[in-house]
UniProtKB/Swiss-Prot annotation:
It comes from Saccharomyces cerevisiae (strain ATCC 204508 / S288c). GO terms for cellular component: cytoplasm; cytoplasmic microtubule; nucleus; peroxisome. Gene3D superfamilies: 6.10.250.1080. This is Nuclear distribution protein nudE homolog 1. Keywords: Cell cycle, Cell division, Coiled coil, Cytoplasm, Cytoskeleton, Microtubule, Mitosis, Nucleus, Transport. Belongs to the nudE family. One of its GO terms (molecular function) is microtubule plus-end binding.
Length: 189
């Protein structure tokens, strides 16, 4: 049951309610505007975040491609290093073998020289030749030799620049070494 109100009180209540309604409508519009601004800001942030996400995905894809390329390049470089290391080891081993062959050849040459000196000194005693001609023979005999190699052979060649008669007294036959023994080997880790 509604209490009895006089007209003036009812008008005041209606006026007060209209004022409250007007204030509520203003507040509602203000909240709606604020809410629209928040929604608009969130949409803008979402779009920006999506764009940033796309950029990040593209960067990640690019970085993964670069990582794959670098890994492939790294594998190729490691293979090249292993190949070069093996080649270096083979060359070092070959050099060691050639050095030993050269030392053996020098020893053989020295033995030939000693034998030649002994033969020449014995011949000198028999022929009573003068000492200067003996020294000349020794000088001719000590001329340089040429050392050359192929893939598996070491060659020695007399390089004396003398006439055939003199060369026959100090002849070092062209020597060829085709067999050797492996003394040391190298291996890659």
């Amino acid at each position: 049951m509604v209490p009895n109100l006089d007209l003036e009180t009812a008008i005041q209540i209606i006026s007060s309610l209209e004022t409250q309604l007007s204030e509520l409508e203003g507040a509602t519009k203000e909240y709606e505007n604020d809410l629209e601004q928040v929604i608009s800001k969130l949409k803008s942030d979402l779009l920006e975040s999506q764009q940033q996400n796309k950029c990040n995905k593209k960067q990640i894809t690019d970085l993964e491609i670069q990582v794959d390329e670098l890994e492939n390049e790294n594998i190729q470089l490691r293979n090249k290093i292993e190949t070069l290391q093996l080649e270096s080891d083979r060359r070092l081993e070959r050099n060691v073998l050639l050095e030993h062959e050269l030392l053996d050849t020098k020893e053989a040459l020295q033995k030939l020289r000693v034998s030649k000196e002994e033969a020449t000194s014995g011949e000198t005693r028999r022929n009573t030749r003068s000492l200067p001609s003996q020294n000349k023979k020794m000088k001719l005999f000590k001329d340089t030799i040429k050392v050359s190699t192929t893939s598996s052979t070491l060659y020695l060649q007399n390089m004396a620049k003398t006439n055939n008669a003199a060369r026959s007294h100090c002849n070092i036959p062209n020597t060829q070494i085709t067999q050797s023994t492996v003394i040391a080997t190298t291996s890659s880790v």
